[in-house]
Amino acid sequence: MTSAAAGLFLVAPAGLSPLLAARLGALLQRRLLDPLPGSAQAPEQQLQQLLDLPGGWLQPLAVDPASDVSERVPASCWAELLGAWRFRTCLLVSEEDRRSGRARSQVVLLQHYKVPLLGVVQCGGPWQPHARRRDGLPWLGWLADDQADPVEALEEEQELQRLLRLRLGPAGL
């Protein structure tokens, strides 16, 4: 297929919350598209339409990337479809996803299907960068919740913004 450098897919175990998608859209100053439902009747047609859009969009996936795709598509799951279409992707996980191993299994799934994974963002919970380095996952950073220290949250958010913009490069802005 083609390289889909104009935008960025947002995925999460069990699907992405609209609130998190909106927060990341505001942080990156990118156009947030309506979540792509996992039950899309013509997913390949919807992906083709994304290629025709001008750059700077974020496309949340409403289901887990391991979820089945329509029976009309040869791909077995959304991760396989994203990899085949070469859509750049960012994985958002909770602290519980990290602790339970779901973050690791999602990264392995996306890598297996050769999805261009920009990295992983932890959403909420305590952020421990030194411990995250030991995880061996491609961590980008942290989006704090309401319980976090506001100064630390702002600093980490700015670092996340900087890293994502670097990984997206000029074509994705």
Segments and roles (model prediction):
Residues 5, 54-56, 86, 117:
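A general structural motif
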Residues 16, 41-45, 99:
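Alpha-helix capping and helix-coil boundary motifs
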Residues 37-43, 51-74:
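Switch II (G3) loop of P-loop NTPases
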Residues 62-163:
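Conserved catalytic-core segment of NTP-binding enzymes
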Residues 45-47, 131-132:
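Short secondary-structure transition/capping segments
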Residues 1-26:
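Walker A (P-loop) phosphate-binding motif
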Residues 24, 47-57, 103-108, 173:
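Charged, low-complexity, helix/coiled-coil-prone segments
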Residues 2, 23-42, 55-59, 122, ...:
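C-terminal accessory "lid"/substrate-recognition subdomains
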